[in-house]
């Protein structure tokens, strides 16, 4: 399915419960996803948290403007310090934020305990190498494609610099740029299996495309036949490598239920 399916998953799955539901959302940012969920009429209450006060302020403002503040309740909160009541929510939602949380064991325990019996945990996540320590095979594939790509497609966004090679970042650099980035991402799937029953898992790649197109994706817009030809090649290469098991998927959508 396309990217819209990723966002419809929480609504589709919550509707399976046959009633309006209460939801917990962690790492909500400016609340764009939560707005979409609230608009469906499937949720009676969504409690959403993020570390950033400016983002929460923006999310709250938009909810009020859209007349959804009776459903959406935003607050600044750190997952390590949140006092989430047990057996409270029908659904827990995490979109591209779980890979910023650590220790995973404690976080997933808290999420599991917050759910009612039979509750759903729905996540859309990066599950690739922790601290972006890309594998040798992954880098070899990406850089092989980059080498054959014409230079006109390799100028970086808002820059004259040419993207020549993708490297594995140093752990020091990763910690310096963002101490929370991908701390335990490679352990997410194994930890999920410990704390939840995984009832649906969709892998959608990104193992090649994410690294390859980072900073140069603006060249590959609809309407340019040559760019579309290259993009089709990139998708084909990644799809084949995923299908054959040569590379794992770095991104997933999963629906889990409490054990």
Q: How would you label these PLM feature ranges?
A:
Residues 2-3, 7-14:
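Short, small-residue-biased leader/transition segments that mark boundaries at the very start
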Residues 25-26, 30-81:
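Class I SAM-dependent methyltransferase SAM/SAH-binding core
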Residues 83-92:
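A short acidic, Gly/Pro-enriched loop at the edge of an enzyme's catalytic core
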Residues 94-95, 123:
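A short beta-strand submotif of the Rossmann-like class I SAM-dependent methyltransferase core
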Residues 105-120:
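A short glycine-rich, Lys/Arg-flanked "PGG" loop and its adjoining helix->strand segment in the class I
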Residues 122-158:
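Conserved class I S-adenosyl-L-methionine
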Residues 154-219:
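Substrate-binding/catalytic lobe of Class I Rossmann-like enzymes that use SAM or dcSAM, i.e.
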Residues 195, 199-259:
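C-terminal lobe and adjacent flexible extensions of AdoMet/dcAdoMet transferase-like proteins
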């Amino acid at each position: 399915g396309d990217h819209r399916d990723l966002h419809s998953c929480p609504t589709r799955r919550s509707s399976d419960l046959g009633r309006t539901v209460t939801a917990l959302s962690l790492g909500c940012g400016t609340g764009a996803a939560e707005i979409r969920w609230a608009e469906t009429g499937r949720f009676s209450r969504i409690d959403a948290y993020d570390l950033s006060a400016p983002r929460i302020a923006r999310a709250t403002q938009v909810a009020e403007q859209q007349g959804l503040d009776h459903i959406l309740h935003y607050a600044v909160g750190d997952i390590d310090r949140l006092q989430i009541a047990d057996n409270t929510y029908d659904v827990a939602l995490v979109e591209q934020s779980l890979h910023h949380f650590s220790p995973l064991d404690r976080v997933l325990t808290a999420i599991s305990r917050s759910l009612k019996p039979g509750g759903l945990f729905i996540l859309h996540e990066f599950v690739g190498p922790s601290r972006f320590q890309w594998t040798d095979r992954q880098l070899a594939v990406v850089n092989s494609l980059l080498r054959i790509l014409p230079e006109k497609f390799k100028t970086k966004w808002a820059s004259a610099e040419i993207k020549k090679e993708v490297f594995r970042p140093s752990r020091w650099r990763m910690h310096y740029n963002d101490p929370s980035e991908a701390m335990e991402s490679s352990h997410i799937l194994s930890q999920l299996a410990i704390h939840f029953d995984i009832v649906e898992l969709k892998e959608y790649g990104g193992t090649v495309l994410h690294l390859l197109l980072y900073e140069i994706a603006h060249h590959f817009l609809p309407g340019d036949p040559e760019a579309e030809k290259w993009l089709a090649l990139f998708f084909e290469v990644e799809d084949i490598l995923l299908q054959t098991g040569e590379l794992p998927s770095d991104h997933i959508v999963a629906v889990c239920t409490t054990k």
